[in-house]
UniProtKB/Swiss-Prot annotation:
Protein name as it appears in the record: Peptide chain release factor 1
Keywords carried by this UniProt record: Cytoplasm, Methylation, Protein biosynthesis
N5-methylglutamine: modified positions: Q235
CC annotations in GO: cytoplasm
Main function: Peptide chain release factor 1 directs the termination of translation in response to the peptide chain termination codons UAG and UAA.
Length: 360
């Protein structure tokens, strides 16, 4: 183990002792905010320190076995113990490296999913609906709740734009690499000649902002307009001005919500989406800078990047960032995303490990 890595682990072990002492103080129990903060820190430290202590135990066993090599009666057994112990040390060191990776503080959050039809007209809008269904099915398998926040339906079905909230522990951490351009190649239902068309949709995955601390929105920066809600084709479906459009003047971000009959609830939903978009904007700017420094392919924050192709005639899904091709398109469109999301997370961890090795 590198001395710098050992030193870092020793610091964390010492910090766990400090945190336990602080949690035992009456003053901490009286201050709930401080108690919660220290409890969260302890929950993060404990698995790392436990793994490090187990590593030290195996290391000590190997050292003891090495001392036994000079005893002819014990030499064979000692050699076996050393061989087994060194293999375990290698495995445990790799596991400790993963535990030391910096954690995204947003990984445990719920998220907002925004899908927009792009090139391809009606076919693109239909594919937007297919993508929403895919993510909804995936959320259901994980026990997450999906709520439509805003939708603009296409006349032939699907969506010109749809925003959904996916509520569940760890939702953002699992789906955060879905942002980007999704391309579909298939024969549209409206195509009489049987020709394959190519169209695309843009997906944005944004962590839900903590209203209390993440984003401060100055009311004077907002322009709020109300209007009558309309359905597919533009016809008005509500006689009252229940729909809400909020413009954040400094950034030009615009959010519309018209799904609820209550103007107040539409305004609340629009403010939630606006806060998530502002947080997302800050995060993408930071990711773009970090990606340029690290030459990262995953999580660059670039929404225009074509990340995935869904080829229906071949039953193929290809993720271009990691050159992964899976011939299980039907299962994926039914929400079987674990292999894709798992591969992206593994690649991200590999990039983090490379950076950690450089930093240690």
């Amino acid at each position: 183990m590198k001395p710098s890595m050992r030193s870092r682990l020793e610091q964390l072990a010492h910090r766990l002792i400090e945190v336990d002492a602080l949690l035992a103080e009456p003053e901490t129990a009286a201050d709930m905010d401080r108690f919660r903060k220290l409890s969260r820190e302890r929950a993060e430290l404990e698995p790392v320190v436990e793994a490090f202590n187990a590593f030290l135990g195996v290391e000590a066993d190997v050292a003891t076995a090495q001392e036994m090599l000079s005893d002819p009666d014990m030499k064979a057994m000692a050699e076996d113990e050393i061989k087994t112990g060194r293999a375990r040390i290698e495995e445990m060191e790799a596991a400790l490296q993963l535990l030391l990776l910096p954690r995204d503080p947003d990984d445990g959050r719920s998220l907002f999913l925004e899908i927009r039809a792009g090139t391809g007209g009606d076919e693109s809008a239909l594919f937007s609906g297919d993508l929403l269904r895919m993510y909804t099915r995936y959320a259901e398998t994980r026990g997450w709740r999906v709520e439509i926040m805003s939708e603009s339906e296409s006349e032939l079905g699907g969506y010109k734009e749809v925003i959904a909230r996916i509520d569940g522990d760890g939702a953002y951490g699992r789906l955060k690499f879905e942002s980007g351009a999704h391309r579909v190649q298939r024969v549209p239902a409206t195509e009489a000649q049987g020709r394959i068309h190519t169209s695309a949709c843009t997906v944005a995955v944004m962590p839900e902002a903590d209203a209390m601390s993440d984003i401060v929105i100055n009311p004077s920066d907002l322009r709020i307009d109300t209007f009558r809600a309309s359905g597919a084709g533009g016809q008005h479906i509500n006689k009252t001005d229940s729909a809400v459009r909020i413009t954040h003047v400094p950034t030009g971000l615009v959010v519309e919500c018209q799904d609820d009959r209550s103007q107040h609830r539409n305004k609340d939903k629009a403010m939630q989406v606006l806060a998530a978009r502002l947080k997302d904007k800050e995060m993408r700017e930071r990711q773009s800078k970090e990606a340029a420094e690290r030459k990262s392919l995953i999580g660059s924050g670039d929404r225009s990047e074509r990340i995935r192709t869904y080829n229906y005639p071949q039953g193929r899904v290809t993720d271009h960032r990691i050159n992964l091709t899976l011939y299980k398109l039907q299962q994926i469109m039914e929400g079987d995303l674990d292999e894709l999301t798992g591969a992206l997370l593994a690649e991200h961890q590999a990039e983090q490990l490379a950076a950690l090795g450089h930093d240690l």
